[in-house]
Amino acid sequence: MKKTTIPTLSALTLAMSLAFGGAAIAQEQVTGNQFWWPEQLNLSPLRQNAVESNPYGSDYHYAEAFKSLDLDAVKKDIKALMTESQDWWPADYGHYGPFFIRMAWHSAGVYRIFDGRGGAAGGQQRFEPLNSWPDNVNLDKARRLLWPIKQKYGSKISWGDLMVFTGNVALESMGFKTFGFAGGRVDDWEAEQVNWGSEKAWLDSKRRNEKGELAKPMGATQMGLIYVNPEGPNGVPDPLASAKEIRDTFGRMAMNDEETVALIAGGHTFGKAHGAHDPSKCVGADPAASGVEAQGLGWKNKCGKGHSEDTVTSGLEGAWSSNPTKWTMEYLTWLYTFDWVQTKSPAGHIQWIPADGKAANLIPDAHIADKRHAPMMFTSDIALKEDPIYREITTRFLKNPQEFELAFAKAWFKLTHRDMGPKARYLGADVPAEMLIWQDPIPALDHLVIDNADIKALGNKILASGLTVPELVRTAWASASSFRGTDMRGGANGARIRLEPMMNWQANNPKELAKVLAKLEKVQKDFNGSLKGGKKVSLADVIVLGGSVAVEKAAKEAGVAVSVPFTPGRMDATQAQTDVSSFAVLEPTADGFRNYYSKDSSHSPAEMLIERANMLNLTVPEMTVLVGGLRALDANSAGVKHGVFTDKPGTLSNDFFVNLLDMSTKWSKSEKQEGIYEGQDRKSGKLKWTATPVDLVFGSHSELRAVSEVYGAQDGQDRFVQDFIKAWNKVMNADRFDI
């Protein structure tokens, strides 16, 4: 029966396919809205990685799952895997350690400081485009080697954590002492929307300005690379030019010169490069472009064995050390022992070997017994010797092995944890005790927090301080909205708004900010003086509470009695705990919530609003209600009146939406101010309002207008206030990883 059923079903399927073939083709050729209206504001960044996309469900909490994990057992399994070479992808030198180090490095190494995107959190290396980047060739096999371990521990360890932890275990299994490990990287379930560049071809580079500088927020020199081309800028083997690019790209990952040298020298102590054949003649499509039968694997190599001694990855070929699966000083030793000359790999890529044929038999082959090679270096390796600053560091490390080892351990820890945010998010027993400046340290809570009665009394004192509702709201928003969810930095905790550099950011209106902070500091000091029993309140808490009681007052004046939630427990950081240059990248070039826009902005005002909302992890309705509420509260930067569509500024009314949707107003571009619009009465021609594109997009964009109509309806006021408070509270607590 089975033998006849299958062909019958196949014939039926074929007949149906032929019958409905026209419809299938039509579906494949659907033309989306973005084609017809390419300038239409894209709201999709605010809809990515929705809770509904998570197969574990809304009740799943990764931190709790991770805490139940026996990390020592996981480590034991990973160590065993290191030397269990698989026939379908044999280990170089019988050890997968170097392969897993590359996997972990390339997972974390896409992090960039300017927008906080990239990094190991989310496990994005599993998804396009990262899973198919030229710089990630064959890392699909590394993750498949790890699948049995991921399968065993399931929801208790994320791919993001597993990849980094495996890199750590790999280092330890080869004799290196790591600095520590922290779990806490929650997996994503779809590819993150990231601007990786506008190039249309791999390894192309069209990301520099007229001065030759890499455009922000890019972190790599070419499309599809993690950092730089190892052969030199655009393949030109110039070590000094390579050093310049290395310094720039690693700096964009928050690494200084010493950390950069430690990472490159430490990482290249292990493993080898793979360029046994010409990729153009041997290597097939990347994972994303491969057929379903490949099951997510790519770069199939048709030459020789297709792996082992025939492996093709970067096209460069060889090892740096004679013992590539052990921690040694050989990388730096050989770098300075030999003079290096250019040669080409079997794949035709430029690399370097010792001059005069020296050390021709120093390096054992990774797979063939009794076969040996000369050591090799990339152009980017020679850069560490030729650049004067890098040379000073490498020679010092060569003379001081323990200093080098600690520098690499700390740099590796920073590389793999930089995108996790503050230490409060770290999980596990291997978290190092030392507090590091790049972790944006905040003092641990050292006092009893105030209770509800204290909160009410403090709120009344803030309202009696002479500060206005707009001033309190603007200050609280400026403090809390510095948060960015891409790398969990910024936010109200720490009260860094009173420190350099935040206190002088243009968007924060420094003159007004100084006045408000002075009054709030006095309130804090006086109130703490009245408290007993070890209770205190931080300035960070006072700033947030000030905004919250101002919102309550504004809602009451609009006829809605509400209580804005407030959770004390924030602490105040010091200037010594604040790296000014590191925090400088958090400065907003635009903040549509405050109608602030500067000439340094990379996109239009409306697009920058979406970017800011995305950083704050807001949804489309949350963004909409916050903009409308902040306009009604008169919270624009520097008090500008654009978008304040109300005759009762400082009151939490839905007037912004009511008046935006009012057909008695006719909008036109201002003839006096570029980028400003004027709303005039259709009958009298009298000027009623002024607005920015950020204001008007809530009436012009069909989806945003749909949300605005909810809040602008006659029954919308109560909903508006309640939704505003929920969204406000979300922003105020965005960095409260302790609650």
Swiss-Prot record:
E.C. designation(s): 1.11.1.21
Coiled-coil segments: none
Cross-link Tryptophyl-tyrosyl-methioninium (Trp-Tyr) (with M-253), where in sequence: 105-227
Catalytic activity as recorded in UniProt: H2O2 + AH2 = A + 2 H2O; 2 H2O2 = O2 + 2 H2O
GO MF annotations in UniProt: catalase activity; heme binding; metal ion binding
Keyword Cell membrane tagged: no
Site (Transition state stabilizer): 102
Pfam families per record: peroxidase
Binding site for heme b: 268
GO-annotated biological processes: cellular response to hydrogen peroxide; hydrogen peroxide catabolic process
Record-annotated active site: 106
Broad EC category: oxidoreductase
Cofactor note: Binds 1 heme b (iron(II)-protoporphyrin IX) group per dimer.
Post-translational modification: Formation of the three residue Trp-Tyr-Met cross-link is important for the catalase, but not the peroxidase activity of the enzyme.
Cross-link Tryptophyl-tyrosyl-methioninium (Tyr-Met) (with W-105): where in chain: 227-253
GO CC term (a single one): cytosol
Function: Bifunctional enzyme with both catalase and broad-spectrum peroxidase activity.
Subunit description: Homodimer or homotetramer.
Protein name (Swiss-Prot/TrEMBL): Catalase-peroxidase 2
Organism: Shewanella sp. (strain MR-4)
Organism ancestry: Bacteria, Pseudomonadati, Pseudomonadota, Gammaproteobacteria, Alteromonadales
